Design a protein with these regions (language model features):
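N-terminal organelle transit peptides
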Residues: 1-83, 106, 120, 148, ...
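Conserved beta-strand elements of beta-rich interaction domains across eukaryotes
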Residues: 52-54, 95-97, 119-120, 132
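Short acidic, gly/pro-rich beta-turn/loop elements at beta-sheet edges
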Residues: 57, 100, 135
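Eukaryotic basic, amphipathic alpha-helical target segments in cytosolic regions
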Residues: 82-85, 89, 143, 147
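Short, structured protein-protein interaction patches enriched in aromatics and acidic/basic residues
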Residues: 84-115
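Helix-rich interaction surfaces within compact, conserved domain-sized segments
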Residues: 106-162
Length: 162
């Protein structure tokens, strides 16, 4: 590496670093998903995700369509909620239903359970047939979560500074 390359200022980040920065910014600086739950009232969010496994395809999991909203919530909304609520515990149970279990009557509850420090603060949100956005909106509304001001959100610059 020449001295010229060492002292030359970078004009852009490398593509893989840029993708990572953009992903982090979606989590920490997205005003749509940035909410703070009352840490003195709630202690845990619990979700169960059910997967059906077919006998011929032992390696691949087939997601139950009633869980699509939960999966969308986990992928798009929960990372930001986790970041802004570090004292809140998030528990996700991945439950595999194979052919042996599917013959039995298994009660599949598509619930988002919110555990409070007191029993009166416990909440359940029915997730069947709802999109991730609707589940998230109901979570925010029922818990009384407070939206974080955009001025408080920190965004990592996507271009090197001089």
């Amino acid at each position: 590496m020449s001295a010229r390359q060492l002292f030359q200022k970078a004009k852009n980040y490398k593509p893989d670093l840029l993708k990572s920065i953009q992903k982090i910014n979606r989590i920490i600086a997205n005003p749509e998903n940035s909410f703070k739950l009352d840490g003195s009232k709630f202690k845990e969010l619990e979700l169960s995700v059910y997967h059906h496994q077919q006998q011929q395809q032992q390696q691949s999991k087939i997601v139950d369509k009633s869980n699509l909203g939960i999966n969308q919530l986990i992928k798009e909304k929960l990372p930001s909620l986790k970041y802004h609520n570090p004292n809140l515990k998030f528990t996700i149970h991945n439950i595999l239903i194979n052919e042996e279990n599917s013959n039995k009557d298994i009660k599949i509850d598509n619930l988002l359970k919110i555990h409070g420090f007191e029993d009166k603060d416990n909440l359940n949100i029915e997730c069947s047939g709802k999109s991730g956005s609707k589940i998230f909106d109901e979570l925010i509304q029922r818990t009384g979560a407070v939206k974080i001001n955009e001025s408080e959100l920190v965004e990592i610059p996507t271009h090197p500074t001089k």
